[in-house]
Amino acid sequence: MKIGGKIVSATLVLMGVLVGLIMVAMSLLLMDYVSKSTESEMEVATSGIKNELEQKKTQMFQLACGFAGNHELIRAIQANDRKAVFEVSKKLVKQMNAEYLTVSDASANVIVRSYDFEKFGDKVDNQFNVKTALAGKPIAAVETGSQIKLAVRAGAPIYDAAGKLIGCASTGVRLDNNHNLVDDMKKQFNADFTVFLGDTRLSTTIKNDKGERNIGTKSAPEVAETVLKHLVLDGTLFGS
């Protein structure tokens, strides 16, 4: 169904919730603020959001698997050469037009982050994609993180030539400071969209009177309560 010229004011809420040690549940909530908007229009918009995220999961899954199988990266890890791992990671990110690549060892200790050479040594086994990859299964999902607050993440195990697990390649597309998702959704559905983590706006098409995006602001309690009464679409995982 075409929404056409009708303006629908909507909010996309992405809330990452850790379940147990490894499970991450995401909820996508789409809210209609205009009474003229129909339920069928909201279903179309919700379906569009889901399809967009599924496409990103597929893309990130393929990227992670490609990074994990790169022979130059594998050799650098085996040589225990952080600088080489960093340089290879930056090159791969540029070649594949990716946002970032985080390489960790078999114990989930970060070897390098392609965007910050000095930030390493911390454990990332709290990330579902990393923990799953180090268990031998590549996977993609929407997750929260310590450095990158919200992203579509994918992790893939890295093996040496003998088939020994030596690490994990984790990549993704950021949702916390990347406004392409909400901007694309606004163009497609003639609506305003906001990405929330909890009740804090991470990305939004809504701007203040200075023309700046309302990033970092909180949602009003009554808005959150209303959103939770509307359609909820559970996020899904993508894996091999």
Question: Which residues make up each language-model segment?
Answer:
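Conserved acidic
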Residues: 2, 174
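Extreme N-terminal signal-anchor transmembrane helix of membrane signaling/transducer proteins, especially
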Residues: 3-36
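N-terminal cofactor/phosphate-binding cores enriched in small/glycine residues
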Residues: 20, 25-32, 41-45, 51-57
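Short amphipathic alpha-helical segments
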Residues: 39, 43, 61, 82-90, ...
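Extracellular/periplasmic ligand-binding regions of membrane signal-transduction receptors
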Residues: 43-85, 105-125, 130-131, 158-172, ...
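Sec-exported extracytoplasmic/periplasmic mature domains
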Residues: 69-72, 94, 134-138, 177, ...
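Extracytoplasmic/periplasmic ligand-binding sensor regions of membrane-associated signaling proteins
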Residues: 86, 93-170, 221-240
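Intrinsic low-complexity, intrinsically disordered coil/linker regions enriched in small/polar
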Residues: 112-114, 120, 175-240
